[in-house]
Amino acid sequence: MEQCDIAIVGAGMVGAATACLLAAEGLNVRVIETRLPEHYAPDQPLDLRVSAISQASVALLDKAGAWSHLQQMRLCPYRRLETWELDGFATRFDSADLGLPQLGYIIENRLVQLALLRRMEDFPNIQTHTPAAVVRLQQGAEHASLLLDDGTELQARWVLACDGAESLTRRLAGIGGSRFEYRQ
């Protein structure tokens, strides 16, 4: 049975960023991911799933060591941002009001994930299990035990469920969740 400090289920933006930041602190990390994204090529069509990454998120990605990788891919600065509710209430932000060249960047989610995955490769204390999925989770007082669908058994002090809104890991741990559906 493999031992680790932290088992992270899901290597999306949240799981991969968390893995990099925890590994930088010297923790022994295992990352379990069912599938990895397609590699980046400049001539690929743009993905529709994008995020508005704030300057604070840029700082986090830089601390995780992934920002330099992202700068080699596609990103677009944004200078103004407006959000609104159904009742018409709107909030507007403008980088000029803050004396900043931009508020942040619009970046394809897949590219953020790829930059973080590339950074994860630099850490000898991160091991990735992919393609793999958790099929059993047992919680103990001092650790949790995970069984992966490839037969791997892991024992971790902490398990982080970063496997999305429909998290199987959260359900296996008996943790409920709630969602708010909003019209887009």
Cite the ranges covered by each PLM segment:
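N-terminal FAD cofactor-binding segment of flavoenzymes
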Residues: P45-E85
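Short acidic, glycine/proline-rich loop/turn micro-motifs
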Residues: A41-Q44, S95-A96, G174
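Residue-level detector of anion-binding/catalytic polar loops
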Residues: N28, W67, Q127, G176
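N-terminal Rossmann-like FAD-binding beta1-loop-alpha1 element of flavoenzymes
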Residues: C4-V31
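Conserved N-terminal helical subregion
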Residues: M73-L172, R179-Q184
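Conserved Rossmann-like nucleotide-cofactor binding loop
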Residues: V14, P37, E166
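Glycine-rich FAD pyrophosphate-binding loop
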Residues: A23-L48
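Long, low-complexity, intrinsically disordered polar/charged segments
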Residues: M1-I8, E33, H39-Y40, E142-L148
